[in-house]
Amino acid sequence: MLTQKQLVQILGNPESYNIEITTSTTNMDKFCQAICAFSNDLPGDDKSGYLIIGAEDNGKLSGLRVDDGLLLKMTNIRTDGNILPQPVMTVERFVLEGGDLLVVEVKPSEFPPVRYRGRIWVRIGPRKSIASEAEEKILMERRISNIRTFDAMPCIGTTLANIDINP
């Protein structure tokens, strides 16, 4: 997760392919789409994506006060069944002068494509959109490359004594 110093530095920069900043606290569709897009990690650079709630695009804090209800709403996104496979994410509140920030860190999925309500969302620069066929193909190929077959997987707990060399 980001440190408070890193968070303040991010707020001084515009949105990018792995940063989304918003003042909204109620647009769950927008949040889920962003989390899905960050999970898909279309550039393939294995960097986390950050959804920052409580600031405007110019970095100015909106004066948000993050309560337990908002924290619970955001953490429930992971398990509500709308984003599959489930995203790997952490949610943290930061208290700053001028208001709170709620930061959702989303790790890239090992098994893309990740779908929100059946649609594959990707992030191209500072905007998110539904994946094209070509983008979907890239994500599917990444999934296939991450799946190891049984003969390439380690057999944990075995030793050389377990190998039968006599047919």
Sequence positions of predicted segments:
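Conserved N-terminal catalytic/coupling substructures associated with nucleotide/phosphate chemistry
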Residues: 1-167
